[in-house]
Design a protein with these regions (language model features):
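Acceptor/aglycone-binding surface of glycosyltransferases and processive sugar-polymer synthases
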Residues: 142-144, 149, 156-157, 313-329, ...
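Conserved beta-strand signature within the Rossmann-like core of class I S-adenosyl-L-methionine
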Residues: 129-137
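Hydrophobic helical membrane-anchoring modules
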Residues: 207-252, 267-270, 274, 397, ...
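Conserved class I S-adenosyl-L-methionine
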Residues: 1-32
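Class I SAM-dependent methyltransferase SAM/SAH-binding core
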Residues: 46-93
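A short glycine-rich, Lys/Arg-flanked "PGG" loop and its adjoining helix->strand segment in the class I
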Residues: 116-128
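A conserved acidic beta->alpha catalytic loop
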Residues: 287-295, 342
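Conserved donor nucleotide-binding strand/loop of the catalytic core
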Residues: 281-282, 295-329
Length: 529
């Protein structure tokens, strides 16, 4: 099986590197891997995927790459990968120590008659709270189905033969019987290996929709199988600071609008201080007329952590109004705006800080980048988001992928001088689009998105109610831009503060370095009315 998998990757040079990188990124985003956490890769072969894992994880994690085939082992050992050890394994139970790994990953490992036995061996290898992520052939993919039914077809395609149909519910039952919890079996990877190189970007752009569309998703070539061993994962994770850029120490105001978030605030603040304590100038919790104990919980936290500040808003409520008040109160050099339920993806924030440390004006956490990962994202929300951004691309900014997410790290003056007109969720589109239209140098950074779990409470975002406001906000911005000028980007040399591309209608707003900061410095009323 290991040799067949190796031959498969080498057979499709136009798509295999992309698929291998996607899988490495999925490991990183699903687990939110912290530096120092240990990874076991099963069936590493010559190390083709190991190279991508090492690169995506920055060489910060000890990787044990288990090779089954002796010939491939000699090829693997010639690779000099940082923090990686190749080992020959013939017996999972005997050759690897128990409870040694935070994560176990692999491709086409369970797809044979002994996968129940192997699940038991893998359970033994994981630490309490450890997780497993495997990529297996999707039995209901037409090519895989034909390959199993018509053996000559399987030999002609050259794929590794799947000895047992990976029936989703059967697998979930066996995994549960072995003791695993949080079992996810999800169709994955709509990109066919024979896709012409010229069509790959198009397939990438539509993959988010196709991989989440009912029925269509069942045609994906792969399943990702995500399991967890019971145990308190959070307490065993390393206590490590991700704040490595000294120039950003004490620089950032974290602005968090909250509505009925008493279940999440304490965990969020604790995690922010643990991961990014050196960056924190202040954490501003904007209580947007909550009916639970959000304000009380925040006051209790602020009594112990002086950098936590509470803004207790009065009606009317709305995300846009909460953001406006939070930005006005912020005193840091940078403002990071986020939702309270982003606690699981905090390790990914380091990529945003890297962007501003490089000298850019800001960064946006993009859920729909080619390297993003979505987990249990509602299909209708994907369709609405993609329709909105298609209009943005056609009518305003061709290059954007996801500017409406409320995860943004900007220079503080950009947000303080930004005029937010939408009182509710559509303000997130304004905070993404208006600075870009004004010419600021802002980069989209791939992140993951995980749907709320039961312990995180319910979201107040209701797509049917907020979608029309997003499109109205877009129409308002299009009208303002078209009234201001007909061409969107002109190169203006020597305008570092404003970014590279500066629109004619925005120049007045950008020429403000020596002026007092005013809420109307960008997108003045006469531009939009």
């Amino acid at each position: 099986m290991e040799q067949s998998r190796e031959a498969y990757w080498l057979r499709y040079p136009s798509t295999s590197p992309l698929k291998l990188r996607w899988r490495a990124l999925t490991v990183r985003h699903c687990f939110h891997v912290l530096p120092g956490e240990s990874i076991l890769e099963l069936g590493a072969g010559s190390g083709l995927w190991t190279e991508h894992l090492t690169g995506v994880l920055r060489g910060e994690n000890p990787i044990t790459a288990a090779v089954f085939n002796e010939d491939l082992m000699s090829a693997a050992t010639r690779k000099k990968l940082p923090n990686t050890r190749f080992v020959r394994v013939t017996d999972l139970a005997a050759d690897l120590p128990a409870a040694s790994f935070d994560y176990v990953v692999g491709t086409v490992i369970l797809c044979h008659d002994r996968y129940a036995e192997n699940l038991a061996a893998l359970y033994r290898l994981l630490k309490p709270g450890g997780q497993l992520l495997f990529f297996e052939a999707n039995y209901w993919n037409p090519q895989v189905l034909l390959k199993n039914i018509i053996r000559p077809f399987g030999r002609w395609t050259g794929d590794a033969r799947c000895h047992v149909g990976m029936r989703k519910f059967k697998l979930m039952k066996i995994a549960s019987h072995q003791g695993f919890t949080h079992i996810e079996v999800i169709p994955y990877d709509i990109l066919h290996p024979l896709t012409p190189r010229a069509l790959v970007p198009f397939v990438q752009s539509t993959a988010f929709i196709l991989e989440h569309a009912p029925l269509v998703r069942e045609l994906c070539g792969t399943l990702y199988i995500w399991l967890q061993k019971p145990g308190d994962r959070e307490t065993r994770r390393p206590s490590i600071s991700l704040a490595t850029r000294r120039e950003l120490f004490g620089s950032t105001s974290f602005v968090v609008p909250c509505h009925n978030e008493e279940m999440n605030i304490a965990r969020l603040v604790e995690a922010l201080v643990g991961f990014y304590g050196e960056y924190i100038h202040e954490i501003i919790i904007v209580n947007d007329n909550s009916t639970d104990r959000t304000a009380e919980v925040t006051r209790d936290i602020a009594a112990r952590e002086p950098r936590v500040k509470l803004i207790d808003r009065q009606p009317p409520n709305g995300v846009g109004l909460a953001l406006r008040d939070g930005y006005a109160a912020a005193t840091g050099r940078y403002i990071l705006t986020m939702d309270c339920d982003f606690v699981h993806i905090l390790p990914e924030f380091r990529d945003l800080f890297e962007v501003v440390a490089e000298g850019r004006d800001g960064a946006i956490g993009s859920r729909f980048s080619h390297e993003s990962v979505l987990i249990n994202y509602p299909f209708f929300k994907i369709v609405c988001n993609r329709a909105f951004h298609l209009l943005v691309k056609l009518l305003l900014l061709p290059g954007v992928r996801d500017v409406s997410n409320n995860l943004k790290l900007y220079r503080a003056d950009i947000l303080k001088n930004l005029r937010i007109e939408e009182p509710h969720f559509a303000a997130n589109a304004e905070t993404g689009l208006k600075p870009l239209l004004a010419g600021y140098d802002i980069k989209e950074v791939p992140i993951s998105w995980i749907n709320r779990t039961v312990e995180m409470g319910s979201s107040s975002f209701k797509i049917a109610g907020v979608a029309p406001r997003y499109f109205l906000a877009l129409l308002r911005m299009i009208w303002g831009a078209w009234r201001g000028h007909r061409g969107f980007s002109q190169q203006v040399s020597g305008t570092k503060t404003a970014g590279r591309a500066v629109d004619a209608f925005a120049r007045e707003a950008l020429d403000k370095s020596d002026q007092p900061k005013s809420p109307a410095a960008i997108w003045r009323k006469d531009t939009l009315s």
